[in-house]
């Protein structure tokens, strides 16, 4: 990547990480896909979500198959061309986070700061589960001819996809 591409890559990645929600793609035990939207926060390279155990099919899917994909996409109202919207896809492995784990309280505080009072309500609901989504290989698309492959924590090694 050129220095200009590296700078644009870093700026656009950070901009997408400011989104309030992500698209979560999971599969059930029969391999049927499901896409849904959920609020998130990040801590380091990892993403954290809180979803209902009983009401959300994607919760059951993550418990049955920990491999998933998340999508962060540029707001339609901010892009000039919907075919060239900035977007970042990340393949992730989901891990449950116990309420007894010290990171649970840290992440709940981050969620409350980002998403407001609803998080306080969720904390008291026993059926809500926190998942840590650990990224593996990822792709950032910034427009036509501007796709980059990278791995978590290795942004400096991002590769411009030309074929």
Each language-model region and where it sits:
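Short connector loops at helix/strand junctions that flank enzyme active sites
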Residues: 19, 35, 43-45, 63-67, ...
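An N-terminal domain-cap segment
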Residues: 1-63
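C-terminal edge-of-domain segments
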Residues: 6-9, 110, 118-163
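Catalytic micro-motifs at enzyme active sites that drive phosphoryl/nucleotidyl and oxygen chemistry
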Residues: 26-27, 38, 59, 77-81, ...
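Short, structured beta-strand-loop surface elements
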Residues: 57-113, 135
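General beta-strand recognition
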Residues: 48-49, 69, 139
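Surface loops and adjacent helix of pleckstrin homology
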Residues: 53, 73, 143-145
């Amino acid at each position: 990547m050129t220095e200009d591409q590296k700078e644009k890559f870093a700026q656009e990645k950070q901009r997408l990480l400011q989104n309030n929600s992500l698209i979560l793609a999971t599969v059930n035990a029969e391999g049927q896909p499901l896409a849904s939207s959920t609020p998130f926060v990040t801590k380091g390279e990892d993403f954290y979500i809180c979803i209902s155990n009983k009401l959300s099919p994607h919760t059951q899917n993550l418990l049955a198959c920990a491999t998933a994909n998340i999508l962060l996409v540029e707001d339609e109202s901010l892009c000039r061309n919907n075919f060239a919207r900035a977007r970042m896809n990340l393949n992730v492995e989901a891990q449950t986070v116990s309420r007894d784990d010290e990171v649970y309280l840290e992440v709940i505080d981050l969620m409350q700061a980002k998403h407001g009072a609803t998080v306080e309500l969720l904390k008291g609901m026993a059926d809500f589960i926190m998942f840590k989504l650990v990224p593996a290989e990822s792709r950032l698309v910034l427009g036509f001819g501007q796709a980059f492959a990278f791995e978590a924590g290795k942004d400096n090694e991002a590769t411009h996809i030309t074929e």
